[in-house]
């Protein structure tokens, strides 16, 4: 890993990285996050009784849509032709809450970590939005990249994927 910030030039100004000379490779990133909530809120969501409708289905779609809009949201991110975005939402009664895992993939010249992080973040935000009427104490946390593959820096994965214990 380089000790240099790639989006800052020698004068300290922010710039978009020129990826034109990079080789196209298969690239993938997986990010995760979680929404901690009251057990009764989790039960309400799992039973499909939230006032705003299907929380899990809506949050999943929101995450996928957000990944495709990452370059509109994060300055200096390249617009990417994603080949796959997938979002999984799993209940965890021990949390209690919902765990989110988002995958982004492409064949291109730059990584997809920001797209995976955006998908995970917006999925969690949507869960919060759809359930906040019954639980204002929900907590969103531990949003992070847990694995990436492809590109010059190669493959990487966290050694302990558990979060929000």
UniProtKB/Swiss-Prot annotation:
Gene behind this protein: moaC
Keywords, sorted A to Z: Lyase, Molybdenum cofactor biosynthesis
Protein name in UniProt: Cyclic pyranopterin monophosphate synthase
UniProt-listed HAMAP family: MoaC_B
Family per record: Belongs to the MoaC family.
Annotated GO biological process: Mo-molybdopterin cofactor biosynthetic process
Purpose: Catalyzes the conversion of (8S)-3',8-cyclo-7,8-dihydroguanosine 5'-triphosphate to cyclic pyranopterin monophosphate (cPMP).
Assembly and oligomerization: Homohexamer; trimer of dimers.
Organism: Brucella abortus (strain 2308)
